[in-house]
């Protein structure tokens, strides 16, 4: 059962192979003071969802067609938890996280509806990951050496 608590999700991403993911998630979560994390009803529902995911390999997520629910859940919790949830379903059913993203793209009417907001947060996450790679210490030193004529 994936532990979908905020603490367990943070630990999961901290121990993930790519340390940049944890840094990006931590940065995003530092400004996510509007999420429903900590709400007792949500926390109980997330715990129950984690338990239900124990048997996820027996469920055909494609036939279940609950992408809207995943979009709404992920859109209202901290980024790390949302990404952990998507990663958990994708591990058991490869491509299921992509189906959720595609469903959001197909159903979004604006960036302010739940699907649009979900997509916007995913785009921010991906762009921050990209920027962290572009402006990594190694590349900045390489540019500095080139500007100083050492390269």
UniProtKB/Swiss-Prot annotation:
Keyword annotations: Cytoplasm, Protein transport, Transport, Virulence
Localization per record: Cytoplasm
Biological process per Gene Ontology, one example term: protein transport
InterPro entries assigned to the protein according to its UniProt record, in alphabetical order: IcmW (IPR049919)
CC terms in the record's Gene Ontology section: cytoplasm
Phenotypic effect of disruption: Deletion of the gene leads to a strong decrease in intracellular growth in human monocytes. Mutant is unable to evade phagosome lysosome fusion, but retains the pore-forming activity. Mutation severely impairs the translocation into host cells of multiple effector proteins, including SidA, SidB, SidC, SidD, SidE, SidG, SidH, WipA and WipB. Loss of this gene has an effect on the levels of IcmS.
Major place of residence: cytoplasm
Cytoplasm found in the keyword field: yes
Its biological purpose: Component of the Dot/Icm type IVB secretion system (T4BSS), which is used to inject bacterial effector proteins into eukaryotic host cells. Part of a subcomplex which recruits effector proteins and delivers them to the core transmembrane subcomplex. The IcmS/IcmW protein complex plays an important role in protein translocation by interacting with multiple Dot/Icm effector proteins to facilitate their translocation into host cells. Interaction promotes conformational changes in the effector protein, which may facilitate display of a C-terminal translocation signal.
NCBIfam families linked to this entry: IcmW_IVB
Name used for this protein in its record: Type 4 adapter protein IcmW
UniProt source species: Legionella pneumophila subsp. pneumophila (strain Philadelphia 1 / ATCC 33152 / DSM 7513)
Protein encoded by which gene: icmW
